[in-house]
Design a protein with these regions (language model features):
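Solvent-exposed, acidic/polar segments of extracytosolic/periplasmic ligand-binding ectodomains
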Residues: 269, 297-298, 368-421
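Extracellular/periplasmic periplasmic-binding protein-like sensory domains
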Residues: 227-237, 253-255, 271-344, 358
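Segments of small-molecule ligand-sensing domains
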Residues: 327-394
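Periplasmic-binding protein-like
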Residues: 107-119, 137-139, 178-183, 231-264, ...
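An alpha-beta-alpha
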Residues: 72, 153-213
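Extended repeat-based interaction scaffolds and adjacent low-complexity, acidic/S/T/P-biased segments
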Residues: 1-50, 86-89, 107
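Short beta-strand elements at the ligand-binding edges of bilobed clamshell
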Residues: 144-168, 300-312
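Beta-alpha junction/loop-to-helix N-cap segments that form part of ligand/metal-binding clefts
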Residues: 64-68, 82-144, 153
Length: 421
């Protein structure tokens, strides 16, 4: 645990390790240091003294970029206030001109790390440069593989959340899923649904049924659950026996859970529709998009029992950094609050990319989730679990002795499930 406190100053971590090594020279680990400790030493040596941040100051991405910049500065001043070493930071406007020229400008300023750009096309342009001279942390994802060995990708991918939901369901013994997602022009709903389905099936699950919806939740959930087929069978039986027999419709029985891809407004219609169509006993799982980000018990009562993943920054509002941010930005960042949190983690990553890239199973317990890096140098997130109770989101307790799936721990968890009504 001497080296597994990723939010502390890495110099302090290393000093604690050196002190422990001197005091416990007879310990096997003192002479056979784990890879993560060697990576920590390297991270201290290679920590960038100057960081350039490429963000747009105008255009359609200016609002999101402003929230990211505020989060990055909040983390910077928090570290400075705690006496931790901090880099010199240069903010460069990426909304004008050639991104390669701007990148070269960052290098002339002595940048040992570049954070950004946020724009997807600009990120792809840098990713295609095989010999990027310094580590570069883009704030968006590219399509396909990056040629640049020093390029790292970080974003708030909803697909990460969908895969985490799939893993949790399998751990809890749920192997038959119904998937419900919105039809939208961007294809966002389908991408999230596909990410869940692919991971669920990789782990041995079966997607029994899936439906997309637009503006008629009652008809959509009725079709998803096969209630219409049940009613049709009853009508056929009545015609066959020529009697008005008693009948209660049933939903299809090959479903263990419903994976719901929805924003708050959509979910407030769909969950009651699921209940109406005899699915009130089914666990409903969702991504963080189901929660608006601030409690609204009067509007979210219908979501009681829905389980979803959410970033720690949204669920845990009592930290010192939250208080500092509230003083600096009393009105918050509205719909960009999660991008503010992304800025916080972008700063905290600046000294730890080396460790995450070189040490398997290493992670940063960030405010956007537990961050780890895959073989393509893409940062992946694991979020905390919550459910709606009395219309308000609450952290879900973890069963003692299980492997936690929360952002501060390991993989999937056995967690206490609420009543679905």
């Amino acid at each position: 645990r001497l080296y597994r406190d990723p939010l502390s100053d890495i110099d302090g971590q290393l000093a604690n390790l050196d002190d422990w090594q001197r005091r416990r020279a007879d310990h096997p680990a003192a002479t056979n240091m784990p890879d993560i400790i060697q990576a920590l030493r390297r991270a201290v040596r290679e920590r960038p003294q100057t960081v350039a941040v490429l963000l747009p100051q105008s255009g359609p991405l200016a609002g999101p970029a402003s929230a990211i910049r505020d989060g990055l500065l909040a983390a910077y001043y928090s570290a400075l206030g705690q006496g931790h070493p901090v880099p010199v930071i240069h903010f460069l406007d990426s909304s004008q001109g050639d991104i390669v020229a701007l990148y070269n400008q960052a290098l002339t300023l002595g940048a040992g790390l570049v954070i950004g750009p946020l724009d997807k096309e600009q990120a792809a342009t840098l990713a295609a440069i095989a010999d990027l001279p310094v580590p570069t942390l883009t704030l968006n994802y590219i399509d396909g593989d990056a040629a640049a060995a020093k390029l790292f990708q970080y974003g708030l991918a909803p697909e990460d959340e969908a895969r985490q939901v799939a893993e949790q369901a399998i751990v809890e013994g749920m192997t038959l899923a119904a998937v419900l997602y919105p039809t939208d022009s961007s294809g966002w709903g389908l991408r999230v649904a596909n990410a869940f389905s692919q991971r669920f099936q990789e782990l041995g699950g079966i997607v029994s049924t899936e439906s997309s919806y637009t503006d008629n939740p009652t008809a959509t959930t009725r079709d998803l659950l096969g209630v219409g087929q049940s009613e049709a069978r009853a009508r056929a039986m009545r015609r066959y026996v020529n009697q008005n027999i008693e009948f209660e419709p049933r939903r299809r029985q090959d479903i263990d859970l419903v994976f719901l891809v929805a924003n708050p407004g959509q979910a407030r219609q769909l969950k009651p529709a699921l209940n109406f169509h005899y699915a009130s006993d089914l666990p409903v799982f969702a991504t963080s998009h189901i929660y608006a980000g601030s409690p609204a018990p009067d509007r979210d009562t219908d979501l009681n029992g829905v389980r979803f993943v959410e970033m720690p920054w949204i669920l845990e509002s009592g930290s010192a950094l939250h208080q500092e941010a509230a003083r600096a930005w009393p009105d918050g960042h509205g719909r960009f609050e999660k991008l503010f949190a992304m800025g916080v983690d972008a700063y905290r990553l600046h000294a730890r990319l080396v460790m995450l890239a070189s040490v398997p199973d290493s992670f940063l317990p960030g405010v956007t989730g537990q961050l780890s890096m895959n073989e393509k140098r893409v940062l992946e997130r694991r979020l905390n679990w919550a459910w709606f109770r009395k219309g308000q989101p609450q952290r879900m307790p973890v069963v003692a002795g299980s492997t936690s799936g929360d952002a501060g721990h390991g993989r999937a968890a056995n967690i206490v499930a609420p009543a679905t009504r």
